[in-house]
Amino acid sequence: MIQKNWQELIKPNKLHVEPGADPQRTAIVVAEPLERGFGMTLGNSLRRVLLSSLQGAAVTAIQIDGVLHEFSSIPGVREDVTDIILNIKTLGLRMHGEGPKRMHLRAVGPGEVTAGLIEVGHDIEIMDPELVLCTLDEGAKLNIEFTVETGKGYVPASQNRPEDSPIGLIPIDAIFSPVRKVAYKVENTRVGQVTDYDKLSMTVETNGAVTPDDAVALAARILQDQLQLFINFEEPTAVVEEEKKDELPFNKNLLRKVDELELSVRSANCLKNDNIIYIGDLVQKTEAEMLRTPNFGRKSLNEIKEVLAQMGLHLGMEIANWPPENIEELAKKLEEPY
């Protein structure tokens, strides 16, 4: 059946997020297990989208009282205009709604001028209020008007100059992406006795306008939308599969035989000697009962617990009406392809 192309591939059960020192800005996002090679495929694709395609807000132009171009200096300001612009380019912003919007800065020396002094409307948030923009000497004054817009990726200053721009408007390079850094690594992970599945760990740092896990979710949604075009068939119906699931009042894995679990020889022999045939027989045993089995030790116990956990099962389960009267017939149906 066509759906086997994707249904029989192993997939992560859920995404694990390890928050950094500042959970709003840094985190490690972990996905496992993945088919071999998928870690690199997904990691590289997500990284490129994260760095290039997420929407964000940035300053696209400024006007400074008494300044005509970016190569000027301002009396009483220790930094020249070029240095001030470099600092403004690193300013993290969150904007609610569409732009362009305006922000204003009015400062009097002496002292450092930080982003927290910028006057903003209700629809703009400054993510780095402690960012130092410049330093003023005694008696120095500084007035700046900022133009803020939304966009994606990197847009050079040459594209941020409107045709009817007034004299003194200085366009600047805009870094719209809320994602600052992305790194990923792929390691081996184990499922049962198979040890060559992929584990993808992505370290994501943002400017605070979006959380790292939300950024990854947005990147995945972008990829999903772009790839949808390449699917040239309709999703096959799963009516037969659903009917079969409805026939069973319990997890269908309970009908599998324990010799399908690819256990070590010692563990498999212990189960066979104890007349444990189906997984349904196995999960009803407690840990204490298993350890009383001849030649069955703690190592074998841990191996079985790990394999059962991959199927959402565990030892010590209570299963009503087990075994079913037609267990062999049900087990045979389970082996048949849909």
UniProtKB/Swiss-Prot annotation:
Subunit structure: Homodimer. The RNAP catalytic core consists of 2 alpha, 1 beta, 1 beta' and 1 omega subunit. When a sigma factor is associated with the core the holoenzyme is formed, which can initiate transcription.
Species for this entry: Paramagnetospirillum magneticum (strain ATCC 700264 / AMB-1) (Magnetospirillum magneticum)
Region (Alpha N-terminal domain (alpha-NTD)): 1-234
Keywords from the named record: DNA-directed RNA polymerase, Nucleotidyltransferase, Transcription, Transferase
Swiss-Prot/TrEMBL catalytic activity: RNA(n) + a ribonucleoside 5'-triphosphate = RNA(n+1) + diphosphate
One GO CC annotation: cytoplasm
GO terms classed as biological process: DNA-templated transcription
UniProt function note: DNA-dependent RNA polymerase catalyzes the transcription of DNA into RNA using the four ribonucleoside triphosphates as substrates.
Molecular-function annotations in GO: DNA binding; DNA-directed RNA polymerase activity; protein dimerization activity
Name of one Pfam family that matches: RNA_pol_A_bac
Designated name of the protein: DNA-directed RNA polymerase subunit alpha
EC number: 2.7.7.6
Region (Alpha C-terminal domain (alpha-CTD)): 250-338
UniProt xrefs under NCBIfam families: PRK05182.1-2, PRK05182.2-5, rpoA
Domain statement: The N-terminal domain is essential for RNAP assembly and basal transcription, whereas the C-terminal domain is involved in interaction with transcriptional regulators and with upstream promoter elements.
Family statement: Belongs to the RNA polymerase alpha chain family.
